[in-house]
Amino acid sequence: MKRTALIAIVAMVAFTIACGSSQQVQKDYADPNAALVSAQNQQLEKYPVQGFAYKSSTMPAQKWDKWADVATPVVKEIINKLPDGYVLQVTGHADARGPEQPTGNKPGNIKISKDRAKTVYDALKRKGVDTDKMTYEGVGSSEPIPGSNPRAAKNRRVTFKVVAE
């Protein structure tokens, strides 16, 4: 009887161990900077640089001065509060007219949009913005304003976004 009870107990323990989950629980650690970065990006969405002429990376002085008076302090503040491992990305855009890549004597939307981003990057640098925490890129016509005609002039713009390095 004792032997049968002992066998039953050993069998139950073995069964319990075998049925137990061997998967380790993974903890989902959220990025502690996610809320700050999201708030910064929402603020930056309000300040696109617009007004570029077709195939041009030159910003009309009047439009730039008006934009810079309002937006430069915001950009400076955001850069000063960037968490470690993040940069402010300056992104140039183009409308969907013309080729994306260089073709013949056409520079292509990628180059034009990158030149626009560089123009704004350099202008912010001249205004005293710390460019050590900034980067720039051109995306051509691949990111039109949602709901807009991709060929519309308002897609010729420069936007800002806080991104991981």
Residue ranges with predicted function:
Residues 1-48, 57-58, 64-73:
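N-terminal targeting leaders that direct proteins to extracytoplasmic destinations
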Residues 41-42, 80, 126, 150:
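Short secondary-structure boundary/capping segments
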Residues 46-50, 55, 84-86, 132, ...:
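Envelope-exposed proteins and targeting segments
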Residues 52-65, 105-110:
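Second-shell loop/turn segments in exported
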Residues 57-94, 98, 121, 125, ...:
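Periplasmic peptidoglycan-binding/anchoring modules of Gram-negative envelope and division proteins
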Residues 93-165:
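Periplasmic OmpA-like peptidoglycan-binding domain that tethers envelope proteins to the cell wall
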